[in-house]
C-alpha cells in the first residue's frame, strides 16, 4: 500500500519540485559508502538533544496578530524539566548532491528542525537524530530512472532505527515519548512503528505519534486494522498511545484526482484524518505558527504584509488567532484536513496565508499545503501533548 502511495508522490514531484531539482541537477556526486553504521553515541550525530546549544536552541518568539491588527508579543522558552521526550524525524530537505545525505547538517536541515520541531521543547525533551535521508537529488534520480524512493528500506530507515534503539537503551529510562514526523520522516516512522513498536512492550511508552504529510490506512468504521494493528487514532487530548495524522489542503483547492495524499488502494480501508483543532470531530480553530518572512521547509514564499498598516514585525514567527479553521473532510478523491482561511479583505490583518507548493506561478494542487502541514497545527499539538502528558503520567502512577 505505501509503495503505491509513494509511486504517486514520485510522479508529481518532477513538476512540483522542479525549481529545487534545478539546483542539484548538474551537481550529483557519487554516493559515499552507506554500509557503515552511524555512531549515535557521538553527539554530532544528533541535531537536537536535551541541554545543548544546538538546532533546537533557537529564537521562537512570536508576534500575535489579532483580527483588529493589534500586535502582542509571545515569548517562548524550552522546559529543561519536561517529564516526557519527543523523537523527531525530519522530511526530505537535504540539498546534498548525493542520493543519500551525509551526516553534516546543511542549512535546510537546520531550518526544518527550527520550523517543525524545536517548539516542542517547551513540552518534552527533544531528540532529533541526523540520518542519511534520501535527498532532493536522490528523489530526482529516482524520477529519471522511473523508480520509487524506498523510504522505508536502506540507510535512511536503518539510521533512524539505530538512533531509536540507541535512544531507548541510553536516554529513555522508561519515560513516555511522542513520535513526530513529516513526509519522508513520517514514512520512516510508520515503518519503525510497524517493525519495532506496534504490539511490542515498548508500545506502552508511546504517549502519541504525530505523523503528518503522509497517509495512514484504517479499516472502514474503525481506528485500527490497517497500517497499525494496535495503535488507534486519537479522538481526545487525554487519550494516549494513539496516532494523529493528516495531510492539509485549502478549502478552496481540495484534493484533485491525482492527489498525493488521503487515499488508499484497498477498498475496505480509508485514509485516516485527525483534526488537532477538534480531535473529537467537527471544525475548530487552528493555532498556527507561521514564518514572518515566508520561510518554508523548502524554499520561500512571499507573504502579504501581516497588517494593513505595515507595522514592522521583528520576531521570526507570527500567530494569527481566528484566521484559520480546520475540519477533516472527504471528497470523491481523498480524505484530508480542510483548511479554511477566514480572512476579511477589508480588515486590518492579512486575509490569506502562504504555503502552497508552486511550479513557477502554478499551484500544485495535488500537494495541498504540504509545505506548512506542521506549521498549521503545531500550537494545537503543543496543547494536546501537554494534556496527553498529564494523562500518561497519571496512568503510570497507578
Predicted regions and their residues:
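Sequence/structural signature of beta-propeller domains
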Residues: 26, 77-78
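Gly/Ala-rich beta-loop-alpha elbow adjacent to hydrolase catalytic centers
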Residues: 181-185, 189
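Short His-Asn-centered micro-motif
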Residues: 89, 180-182, 209-213
